[in-house]
Amino acid sequence: MGVPKRKTSKGRRDKRRAHLALSGPALAKCPQCNEMRLPHRVCPACGYYRDRAVLEFEEE
């Protein structure tokens, strides 16, 4: 089994992790109400998914 000959330096370790940064969530505009929502999910503002009302909201 391969064993490291030298301790990996902090610089080399951090260079390797340069591309591991997290990005924000991908958002899409709801065609019904123009609110931002997660793609492939029901819009939490209006309850529509693929031009159909999936959730019912109570009127106050």
UniProtKB/Swiss-Prot annotation:
Stretches of Basic residues bias are at: 1-19
Where do the record's region annotations for Disordered lie? 1-20
Gene3D superfamilies, per this entry?
Single helix bin
Keywords for this protein: Ribonucleoprotein, Ribosomal protein
Give the highest taxon in the source lineage.
Bacteria
Report any one BP term from Gene Ontology. Answer: translation
* Annotated GO CC locations: large ribosomal subunit
Entry's transmembrane regions: none
Among Pfam families, the record links this protein to:
Ribosomal_L32p
GO MF term list: structural constituent of ribosome
Q: Which family does it belong to?
A: Belongs to the bacterial ribosomal protein bL32 family.
What protein name applies here? Large ribosomal subunit protein bL32
Q: Which gene encodes it?
A: rpmF
